[in-house]
Amino acid sequence: ICVDLYETLQKNGEEAYIATGRGSLPPGIKGYVIGNKADFVCHVMKNFTRGKAGFGSKQVTEKFLHWLSEVQPDLVHLHNIHGFYLQIELLFAYLKEHDIPVVWTLHDCWSFTGHCAYFDYIGCEKWKEENGGCHNCSIHKSAYPYAIFKDNSKWNYKRKKEVFTGVKNLTIVTPSAWLKGLVEQSFLKEYPVEVIPNGINLDNFIPLTEEQETK
């Protein structure tokens, strides 16, 4: 998705960059690779032992933000910021301080829970503010991001709320009306939410003819 957006912007004469926390950038793509394997392992272990996914990777995030200051973007488009490569407190403090317009495309529910990326399969609604927010997580050991030794969902929920709210110019994008509905029940409800479905490759996926449908 990021590469498609990048290439479209480039074709339209816009300057664009991609920052990633995994592997390397595709050939010809301008951008920045955040962190390294050693930092990734340290962040994973911090989460395993203390349940703090998103709160590691301090030094590599500082280096990334230094690079971002050199780029001076007119807009920052976030996608998944979990995955053990960013320190969310530093990132959002920077975005708030510099008053940069932000688009945040959510691909799951991690941003507004105290632990998990999905909760429908266990019918959990603790993440809703009316229910007091996440606490006593029953899946912190069994569901990504796998906090094996400590349930830190209550602290995570409170801190994420403090970190992710209060951005002056932020718009959330979801790929489905279902996820939009969840966001509007979460502590992110202060932000406008737009639904933009994920695109598909029309060279591979095309409507069938009536004859093909009957086969």
Question: Where would I find each of the regions flagged by the language model?
Answer:
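N-terminal subdomain of nucleotide-sugar transferases
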Residues: 1-31, 69-71, 96-101, 168
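Membrane-proximal helix-turn-helix segments that form the acceptor-binding/catalytic region
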Residues: 96-97, 110, 127-172, 187, ...
